[in-house]
Amino acid sequence: MKANRLATALASLLLCSAPAFAATPPSSSASASSASTGSDSAPTESLTERLMKPLSSVTTGTVTVEGKAISYKAVAGTLVIDGTGAKESTPEVAMSYFAYFKQGVDPSKRPITFIYNGGPGSSTVWLHMGAWGPKRVVTNDDTHTPAAPYQLVNNDYSLLDASDVVFIDMPGTGFGRLLPQGKDDAARAADRKELIKKIWGVDGDAHAFSRFITQFLSKYNRWNSPKYLFGESYGTTRSAVLAGILEEQDNIDLNGVILLSQILNFGTSIDGPQGDPGNDLPYVLALPTYSATAWYHHKLPKYDGEKLGQLLKDSVEFA
């Protein structure tokens, strides 16, 4: 059912390994329709000069989800994010995105979900090409994916039947760039250092995302759409900060926030607890999840059948 797509899709998350994206994949069934830069660009313009204008390329395609074909418009582009205060009219960063819009529906009633990976320092290629986009990279299982060639296939688990999706790359990743200003190389290098200090931090990162989202909503006239955030790993930390900024400073009431592989407290992460000797919380908190995983794979005969609830209770008490 469409109402359950965001929730049920979580259980079907496809795991992808980094080498799967090391080479250029084969072309998909999407067909190019137009490309624009926001204004004519002279051939002599530098990359930085071009990125100071919003860029976009539009294609169309079809994805099949749960047996139903969904026609969509895809936009690959950048938005230019200006500074604040005295620099509110000065470009600071170009953030890249890939947006997919279902065609033939009223966009004002259509949910829109802003999706991003974490790192911090990662683009959103993983959730885009491995989980929720209309196409996905084929992986045989959840182990290391062999070398090229790789194949793109229809993604049966795409969220496009339930929501339009926008995959956002954090500043400095994907096709985005920091945009240092200055009359010469030394001035630009100094400004770049200031931008790094400002943007590559918890608050600066979240503020950049908030300005991206508000600009995106205006550009595509989606202010009346139900709005969701979907963050993975460090992206869940970003969501916690970003949701507050959107509500308190931008007057945007979100309809929901989805946290995947949450890392709101790094002190309780089971990924590398040996780096914090004496802190046993990661082991204590992970035991119920490990127990449930073992139960799913039928490794605990005592709890086979409908005994998951009892297993979790016993795991919590033991932990």
Q: Model segments located where?
A:
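Gram-negative bacterial Sec-dependent N-terminal signal peptides
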Residues: 3-21
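N-terminal cap/lid subdomain of alpha/beta-hydrolase-fold enzymes
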Residues: 33-45, 86-194
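N-terminal cap/lid segment of alpha/beta-hydrolase-fold proteins
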Residues: 51-104
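Phosphate/oxyanion-binding active-site loops and adjacent basic polyanion-contact surfaces
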Residues: 89-95, 198-210, 234-239
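A catalytic-pocket lid/entrance helix-loop region that shapes and gates access to the active site
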Residues: 134-138, 243, 247-319
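Alpha/beta-hydrolase active-site loop
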Residues: 160-163, 170, 197-218
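Glycine-rich nucleophile elbow surrounding the catalytic serine of serine-hydrolase chemistry
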Residues: 175, 231-244
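Alpha/beta-hydrolase fold nucleophile elbow
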Residues: 222-234
